[in-house]
Amino acid sequence: MKIVVPIMPTSLEEAQALELSRFEGADIIEWRADFLDKHSILTVAPAIFEKFAGFEIVFTIRTTREGGKIELTDGEYVTLIKDVAAIYSPDYIDFEYFTRKEVFDQMLEFSNLVLSYHNFEETPENLMELLSEMTNLTPRVVKVAVMPKNEQDVLDLMNFTRGFKAFNPEQEFVTMSMGKLGRLSRLAGDLVGSSWTFASLDNTSAPGQVALADMCRIREVLDAD
């Protein structure tokens, strides 16, 4: 199970001040570019990609439609993704599939898409259908993050992940229940076929994230013979 650490600089100065040594144990860096205004993203990008050249990088613009910090038209969203991809070739590109379906055809040139769905309110009853639709598109990664209201929601997500992975062994899935209630899904995702877990340094990018140092220790225990 790979550990992903989000970074959320709000300025070039904050990006330059990130201390590389603090990310020891992380496998992937997710750059949450939505903490910048749209005109600053390309200005800050060189600092991010140079500093974290030794890591895999996920480029993410999480818009307000799915719990993020920036409002963009479909055109602005696609243009920013394509501009960053053309210059820096991030290892993964996050795409908010269900809120941007109308422009998904403009993403077909990318083989490294993380098709994502985020719901900070609930675990929807049609979660299986959502997983199925994204899986059928065979992206690099299918990512789902939902909010549980009870323990059964957490178990349902984990069970669905296990089932989809069993029937689609070549597809990478990244799934999590958010908040304290859903923390188990972040710790035991590898058991059911979720390839990544997200951990934090100072600030979390989603409810329920575990600190990087703690997650590294947990992974060490789980991976031990």
Swiss-Prot record:
**Which UniProt key words apply to this protein?**
Amino-acid biosynthesis, Aromatic amino acid biosynthesis, Lyase, Schiff base
Q: What is this protein called?
A: 3-dehydroquinate dehydratase
Question: What reaction gets catalysed by this protein?
Answer: 3-dehydroquinate = 3-dehydroshikimate + H2O
Q: Write down the NCBIfam families for this protein, in alphabetical order.
A: aroD (TIGR01093)
GO molecular function list: 3-dehydroquinate dehydratase activity
Q: What does this protein do?
A: Involved in the third step of the chorismate pathway, which leads to the biosynthesis of aromatic amino acids. Catalyzes the cis-dehydration of 3-dehydroquinate (DHQ) and introduces the first double bond of the aromatic ring to yield 3-dehydroshikimate.
What's the subunit arrangement here? Homodimer.
Family under the similarity heading:
Belongs to the type-I 3-dehydroquinase family.
Q: List, in alphabetical order, the GO biological process terms annotated in this UniProt record.
A: 3,4-dihydroxybenzoate biosynthetic process; amino acid biosynthetic process; aromatic amino acid family biosynthetic process; chorismate biosynthetic process
Pathway, according to UniProt?
Answer: Metabolic intermediate biosynthesis; chorismate biosynthesis; chorismate from D-erythrose 4-phosphate and phosphoenolpyruvate: step 3/7
Question: Record's InterPro entries?
Answer: Aldolase_TIM, DHquinase_I, Type-I_3-dehydroquinase
Question: Which Pfam family, just one, is annotated for this protein?
Answer: DHquinase_I
Which gene is annotated as encoding this protein in its UniProt record?
aroD
Q: Which domain of life is it from?
A: Bacteria
